[in-house]
From Swiss-Prot:
CDD domains: 7tmB2_GPR128. It is found in: Membrane. Its main location: membrane. Keywords: Disulfide bond, G-protein coupled receptor, Glycoprotein, Membrane, Receptor, Signal, Transducer, Transmembrane, Transmembrane helix. Residues 1-26 form the signal peptide. GO terms for molecular function: G protein-coupled receptor activity. Disulfide bonds join 383-410, 398-412. GO terms for biological process: adenylate cyclase-activating G protein-coupled receptor signaling pathway; cell surface receptor signaling pathway; G protein-coupled receptor signaling pathway. It comes from Homo sapiens. The gene is ADGRG7. Residues 275-428 form the GAIN-B domain. The keyword Zinc does not apply. This is Adhesion G-protein coupled receptor G7. The lineage of its organism: Eukaryota, Metazoa, Chordata, Craniata, Vertebrata.
Amino acid sequence: MASCRAWNLRVLVAVVCGLLTGIILGLGIWRIVIRIQRGKSTSSSSTPTEFCRNGGTWENGRCICTEEWKGLRCTIANFCENSTYMGFTFARIPVGRYGPSLQTCGKDTPNAGNPMAVRLCSLSLYGEIELQKVTIGNCNENLETLEKQVKDVTAPLNNISSEVQILTSDANKLTAENITSATRVVGQIFNTSRNASPEAKKVAIVTVSQLLDASEDAFQRVAATANDDALTTLIEQMETYSLSLGNQSVVEPNIAIQSANFSSENAVGPSNVRFSVQKGASSSLVSSSTFIHTNVDGLNPDAQTELQVLLNMTKNYTKTCGFVVYQNDKLFQSKTFTAKSDFSQKIISSKTDENEQDQSASVDMVFSPKYNQKEFQLYSYACVYWNLSAKDWDTYGCQKDKGTDGFLRCRCNHTTNFAVLMTFKKDYQYPKSLDILSNVGCALSVTGLALTVIFQIVTRKVRKTSVTWVLVNLCISMLIFNLLFVFGIENSNKNLQTSDGDINNIDFDNNDIPRTDTINIPNPMCTAIAALLHYFLLVTFTWNALSAAQLYYLLIRTMKPLPRHFILFISLIGWGVPAIVVAITVGVIYSQNGNNPQWELDYRQEKICWLAIPEPNGVIKSPLLWSFIVPVTIILISNVVMFITISIKVLWKNNQNLTSTKKVSSMKKIVSTLSVAVVFGITWILAYLMLVNDDSIRIVFSYIFCLFNTTQGLQIFILYTVRTKVFQSEASKVLMLLSSIGRRKSLPSVTRPRLRVKMYNFLRSLPTLHERFRLLETSPSTEEITLSESDNAKESI
């Protein structure tokens, strides 16, 4: 009956331990996926997050508001509320935007799914927000049909321009085909030979602004599939249109156009025109953010200047000049430069009506780089212009100019569409060096593992070869991993950081076009260390699993001897399988990203030399998930199952023939259980508990995890080396030798008596009494005698 109760208790303990382990691992995996999907947490700003309201963000010392809000803290409304007019319902519309109606064309119409009408939200002359009249579209027309109509010379361009503007009002729905058709239609409206009305052209400007809200992928497909020069034609037509506004301007959220005319008076000598774009509370362009000044001496940027262009020209040949500012570079699809960051790259165009007799106009520019300084550091830039024939950026005639005011300066000896292609380094927050706890723990582990390996090899003849072999390989892999972790986990690029906004380190003589807007300084050594850490940690877990499998066969299956070639088989698994996993991981990543010079960052992190943390949408492709977390989780689950099985069936199994006390027996069971848990790597389950959201709880589990796992080598040394009789015997000899040497030096003239020690052990029928006696005699020999009540005294060594 008692044995049944004990068995039921052991089964209950096993079930509870298994459930707890499963819950911890399951919650840990779930938290990993959730944290990866949420993305990496951004560094906290010194300004409270509550300062900028209504979705505003704190950047470069001020609040950057969304289109719907403005003001110092983004608390002033900049939108028209929901409205209903002529049976059409409109949602909230930002100022300066056309809002589409919620009513859409029917499924049986050519324009199915598109809004039936649009409505403008604008500012009055007195600064009041007001809604304009509703413009109703034609559901029987779409962009493809309008593209065919605009080719007809007699087509009503006003109606076509209005229809295109309505059809492009919802930029989220625009496809590459829609953009191509709309671009061709707008290009015809701006064509001077079509003599479109000024109203039609102004509406076409609204269409271009709406097109620039479409996705970058859609524009890339346009550039890749368009058979004609639709984008190039539109760019040329916009330049020409900028000369026709007199001294007026047209400003939309994504594009601003301004002209300047010169009188015939004083038409001798040079003339300079300065065009400025000021920083705003949002990323959209507004009419109050652009200025033009004629007959100026030079550039004059201030703290609010985002970009400024100085056009140097000969007045007697020039009567008109025009400027165009694009909010982003989506119309300029480059084959050599790829933008990966999410900040907008403004493009500025300048054009004059110079005739062929004088092409002496030149351009000076200053740009204030607008980017997230918490995430990026300016690395370099290139002064470029858009080559219309090559359909790409070019540097001919452009050069960098040095400045001490924090602006990026360029100079070109011709006029066209200009840009500054900036490259950035990510401002990585490199972690501090390992703390004292990690250093001390790793040092103790390295020492313990080295001593364990030496001891196991030296005393291998008195041990079972298979057990010694598994333990030695486990210790070697852990030893190498700890050494690599201590001396190689930090990225040496940490020492190459420069201060934010420091343009003095830029090479002004180099004006080459970069391949991308973000750059990472390559560090092959860090990549190699990350691969080695990846490999040796997988090797460690593999030998943990092999240790569990070996003990299972020895203790549960009682296979003595082990299968033939067992050592060779487990050696190939322990060292070969992790090598295959690492090789496949690196090979796949390199094959997919080998053309990218920064391919190594798809494998490792930049902050530390370890596997890369995936982007929010890259969980499935993550090397950390498939080549580390998944195999380690499988190993831990199997090791926990074997650990519970061995603990219940072997370590904590009741033995009726025990002769020691219950206290000693329980202590031995606890030590044996800890010994098995250490070589099985059970303490790594604590890593899953570090994924909780509560900072205080996470810190506690982090310290516990660090304490148990950095000292794992020391634990193995204590449990598998210090506790052995061979080590204790050899250690006692060494201590006795050192003690005797010390005594001889301290008391050289004292004659010590010769002692003979006899030890008697009395074992009664109840094993709770254990007594020892010592007798002092003149003989140097020592003997131990064990006595019991039922037997005569027996002498033993």
